[in-house]
Amino acid sequence: MTIPFSPNPEQINVSSVPATQAEVQVEYTLRTKSDAIEHTSQSNRLKDLAKDPWLRTTGNRHASSGTEIPSSEQTKSARILVVGAGYGGLLFAVRLLQSGFSLGDILLVDAAGGFGGTWYWNRYPGLMCDIESYIYMPLLEETGHIPSRKYVPGEELRGHAERIAEKWKLHTQTLFRTTISCLTWDENKTQWIATASQSNSESQESNSFVISADFAILANGTLSKPKIPDLPGVDDFAGHVFHTARWDYDYTGGSPSIPVMDRLKTKRVGVIGTGSTAVQVIPQLARWAGELTVFQRTPVAVGLQENQETDRIWWSEEIDKVGPGWQRKRCENFNAFITDTRQEKLEEVMKEDKVQDGWTRFPSFSAAIGGAHNLQPDFLQLVVKVDEERQKTARQHIKSTVHDPATAEALLNSTYSWCKRPCFHQGYYETYNLPHVKLVNTAGEGVTELTRGGVLLDGKEYELDLIVLATGYDIGSLCPADRAQISVRGRKGHLMNQKWAAGPATFHGVMTRDFPNLFFPGTSQAGVTANQSYMFDRAAEHVSYIIRQAYNHVAAGFANPKVCVEPSQEAEDWWTMETVARAKAFAATKICSSGSYTISARSGGSGNVEKTARHMPWGEGMASYVKILEEWRKKGHMDGLEIAWKGT
């Protein structure tokens, strides 16, 4: 079947689009070549970086309490299994409880030793959220918590996860240090059977067992598994190496709460990477390292993050003024402004920018996440024009801030702002004015070789004592099963990743046929925005409704019914084709040379037009997507779903 898809992102001539500067085409060529040779490291030395450094194995670590599986126990059962105990998993658990399920109905599992997801694993110095904490930290209205700052540090974000778990008593229903390798649908029992393993917090041993669940939700995030680049010579390097997601305070000194890295005062430190993590960690390392060398493959645009302490008087007045539902309304106000390329405030609630930060002054980001205007014929020209003004201001700021002209030139971002997730910080560019800080521009090639002494680049050796890998996270496949690192087999043994190989097919972006009672929030065929917590919350709200209503459809008189719900073939085809019809909303991302928002990254590198279109998010943006789900629920008919049950 051929799907109309015009303009076709795969066929856009990059050179035909007005460029912000000539270097766009140069970086496109360099970065594409570099990405082609990028691999994940197979080094035995770096494989150790995947281990959890925060468990209580050395006596000075702290892990959250959870449920231990006795070695004699072989099976565990639950009505609803939630994979993931970060903000996503917690939101699903809370929304399920609010929809009427009991605490005993829910079981959460996570490979980490505590709650928090990415905020459990990431504890590097300088860590903070880059989305306003008043909209990013979930369930503020329900918990009554007031964030300390507009953008809070990582320790507070992790603490908030613990706060949510404590309020809803989720510790008693969570298995930490637990991984699931296989998830198999049992048609006869109308259950998912999970093969699980829980590691011992005090030893290297693990206990294997089975979890049976009526429903399963893959709520694991994408920012927990370190992306380790292939670096020839890494095993020969005499110094120390670690990834930012597994920070080694034993080597640097300090702790997550007090990052006084006094052991680096005489050290020569190298940082590989200049993405979102590096932007936060580089200024902190510069405060303590004897020498700091930053190896940059491609520059990133860093906007000013105007952080400040929360004014509690303002907080109370703002909540009283907006009333119940204030956090969701603030989230939706944020979503509206980051996609408002025409600067049209069509609704009363959107006339005032509530968040007022670098994000809400960045409407060209709609090129990456979709929006109400993306499907209009002149959108590509419009978004380029809007972004050119932003880029012009950013370049002027860099040139006026960084003293050395050559360094300033190397830091200039030469791609459109929507191509990579933007960064925001106070003081990143000023760091390069310090005499002991040096920027090494690899012109798109990246670091390709290590020696015993350090980094070898263009025949020159940079001697180092410590190499910090700020190389991001291994997002992996776009298939929900692969991202969860679980082999998922549905009806008749069908593998989910095999179905995804032909291109995703979903209903509302959260479920797929032949995999009944399975839900997976994600980006393909679903609404997306910069605030991932909001995305998780809307998905949790929708999935909780579906599961609750599925039970409500059970005929009276059934005791302990087994419910089976999945989309009909017609409904799945319809939603998939509706997504495909809007995929041209992301045509502007074809211009991008790199980043998680490129056509290639979102489609797994597919050159097939229809398959590429199937991988795209909902093109009309998050507000449109949420409205469709709300109207569907309001009807109350569960249209498009097949519901069956059996009981006694």
Swiss-Prot record:
Binds 1 FAD per subunit. NADP(+) binds at M128, C129, D130, T274, G275, S276, T277, A278, V279, Q280, R297, T298. FAD binds at T118, W119, Y120, W121, D130, I131, Y136. Keywords: FAD, Flavoprotein, NADP, Oxidoreductase. Disruption phenotype: Impairs the synthesis of terretonin but accumulates preterrenoid. The record marks R421 as: Transition state stabilizer. FAD-binding monooxygenase; part of the gene cluster that mediates the biosynthesis of terretonin, a fungal meroterpenoid that acts as a mycotoxin. The first step of the pathway is the synthesis of 3,5-dimethylorsellinic acid (DMOA) by the polyketide synthase trt4. DMOA is then prenylated into farnesyl-DMOA by the polyprenyl transferase trt2. Methylation by the methyltransferase trt5 then leads to farnesyl-DMOA methyl ester which is further subject to epoxidation by the FAD-dependent monooxygenase trt8 to yield epoxyfarnesyl-DMOA methyl ester. This is FAD-binding monooxygenase trt3. It comes from Aspergillus terreus (strain NIH 2624 / FGSC A1156). The gene is trt3.
